[in-house]
Each structure stands twice: as structure tokens, then as C-alpha cells.
Amino acid sequence: MARGPKKHLKRVAAPKHWMLDKLTGVFAPRPSTGPHKLRECLPLIVFLRNRLKYALTGDEVKKICMQRFIKIDGKVRVDITYPAGFMDVISIDKTGEHFRLVYDTKGRFAVQRITVEEAKYKLCKVRKITVGMKGIPHLVTHDARTIRYPDPLIKVNDTVQIDLGTGKIINFIKFDTGNVCMVIGGANLGRVGVITNRERHPGSFDVVHVKDANGNSFATRISNIFVIGNGNKPWISLPRGKGIRLTIAEERDKRLATKQSSG
């Protein structure tokens, strides 16, 4: 009989975007419980060992973490399987590096280096707004933060800018047509574009239509949309390709062009 939560994760059952090979072992690091879901996070060990190549083994990652070098969203994390997720800021004080986890157009977490200034804040999507004890309004974000007494103008699906030093809201972006957004789920994961319109379907999912910088349009559920800036100016730095997904033919042409220019 199974007692308690699962403690293991087989390598073949691990999320595809971690990009672990099948043959190096049987198991993968199972992320701890935390602010992001298992299928939508990147454990710290995968980030440090497989992405940044700062360690060769899990043991080495543990030694790095236990020296309290790694901060996520401004807090020291020593758990090597801590689930870092979309929009999290990972800081390594020893090397003076800062990274933000954002999706590339293939739906994987890109290693996006950011400046010290940008590492001071993060964007969070508002998941729900409730009124708690004694009539205190609360707002819950996509990374499980609960913030009391938010601005009454902030609504569900808006994006709030949070100062990581204080955990307070410093600004917010309305969910509105004409604002730039990133898709954080579904088949269009990682694409960036401007919201053109929103179809309301009471009792079902609202559908949002988005147009990217190349003029390609696509649609997705409202739950997959994360507004990242006012107008077409994003408040965060985007990974290479700026969230524009190329077709297979376009990718091939681009590869050939770079080959010819370098050859």
C-alpha cells in the first residue's frame, strides 16, 4: 500500500523540457513541493548541472547549494530539488550572475541572463482575488504568493510587478487588447505577441487571439496568457528569437543563411 507522497521520478517520466537523456540513469530528480507544479518547473539541480554546467554530479550541486551561494527570488535556497519556475530570478552572488527563467519558442526554459537592475523585480500573473478574514482583500499569484491589500484596480489575469526585496507590488499591467503577452502553456508555449481580442465563453474557456511581431496570429486559452508589458514594450528581457516561432522551412533558411555568411 502506498503511504504518503511519491518520492521518486523515473527518467522517462520526467518532463520533456528538462532535456534529460534516457541512458544516463534510471531516475531523475523529483522536484520538492513548492510554488510551481512538477510539470512546469525546473529543479535547481537540473539548472546548475545540465544547463549552466557548473557541476558534473548531483553531489557537486549539493556542495554548491549548501554553501548558500544560490538565491531564488532573493531568498537563499539550499534544497537541490527546489522547483524554480516561470519568471523566477536565480542569482549566484559568487559569480555576480542573475538569470530569469522564461520559455523559448520550443517550450523549454531558456538560460536568460539579466542585469542587476532587472533582477530586483519579477512579474506575477494574478490567479485569484479573494476577501479574507475581517474583510481584508487578498490576491494570489501564479507562483503562490499571497499579497494583502492590493490596489483595487488589479483584477484576475492582470500582471503585477513585485519588488523581490520587500515582496510588495510596485506596478501592474492590465489584461487588455494591445498589450504584449507570453504564452505559458499549450501548443503555443513560449510565443510572444500582442493581444488582438478576447472571446468570452461563459461556462467554458475564454479564448484569446494573439498576433506576433511577424504578423502570424494564433489563439489560446486565457489561462495560458501572461501579460509581460504595456503596449508592445515588454518589461522583461526576452530570450533569443524574441518569442517568434519560425516554421521548419524558415528555420532551415535561417540556418543556411548563417552557414553561407560564416562560410
Swiss-Prot record:
CDD domains per record: KOW_RPS4, S4
Disulfide bonds: none
GO molecular function: rRNA binding; structural constituent of ribosome
UniProt GO BP: translation
Keyword tRNA processing: no
GO CC term (a single one): cytosolic small ribosomal subunit
Start and end residues of each S4 RNA-binding domain: 42-104
Keywords: Ribonucleoprotein, Ribosomal protein, RNA-binding, rRNA-binding
Gene3D superfamilies: 2.30.30.30, 2.40.50.740, RNA-binding S4 domain
Keyword Iron belongs to the record: no
Top-level taxonomic group: Eukaryota
Pfam families: 40S_S4_C, KOW, Ribosomal_S4e, RS4NT
InterPro entries given in the database record: KOW, Rib_uL2_dom2, Ribosomal_eS4, Ribosomal_eS4_C, Ribosomal_eS4_central_region, Ribosomal_eS4_central_sf, Ribosomal_eS4_KOW, Ribosomal_eS4_N
Annotated signal sequence range: none
PANTHER family attached to this UniProt entry: 30S/40S RIBOSOMAL PROTEIN S4, SMALL RIBOSOMAL SUBUNIT PROTEIN ES4
Family assignment from sequence similarity: Belongs to the eukaryotic ribosomal protein eS4 family.
Name of the protein this chain belongs to: Small ribosomal subunit protein eS4
Organism of derivation: Pongo pygmaeus
